[in-house]
Amino acid sequence: PHAFAQPDAAKTQVKQSETAPVRSITEWNLAGSGKLAIDGYDPVAYFPEGGGTPTKGSEKITVKHEGVTYRFANEKNRDAFLATPARYEPAHGGWCSWAMREGDKVDIDPEAFIVKDDRLFLFYKGWLGDTRSKWQKGDHAAEAREADDAWKKVSGETARSVKPAGDSAQAKPTER
């Protein structure tokens, strides 16, 4: 029986990878040849279950997912990411969501963020202002749609739109 389990598992793995959507990470905001996401910040740490605070990940706790390297502050966050990576990946390839509305790829301040509708939105904050505060003044859903549409034009990727379970009171954004 064990001899048959191995080939079946291998077939399942091949089948899953054949059906997985192919994405090009060439348009993503990634640092260096290691293709590091979010300047090395832990993507799970932004979400309530990871503490809700931007936290630098460790060089010793990393995951390479679909060509992108993520760092994690601890094994618990790494394991949460491995269970559902799409949930924790930043919107718009890790570029500033405000600028992406116009199709512009603008670098981010990893500490300027909003988690809303179960998605991580990152923003520019620097000499030219704080784009997160501009985003907050508008209609989040409309701005997210604009940025998602522009991201599709820039990257060819369809943005993930996942709403949290339960009522809208649970969808309260985490921000800093």
Regions found by a protein language model. Give the residues of each.
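C-terminal segment of classical bacterial N-terminal signal peptides
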Residues: 1-4
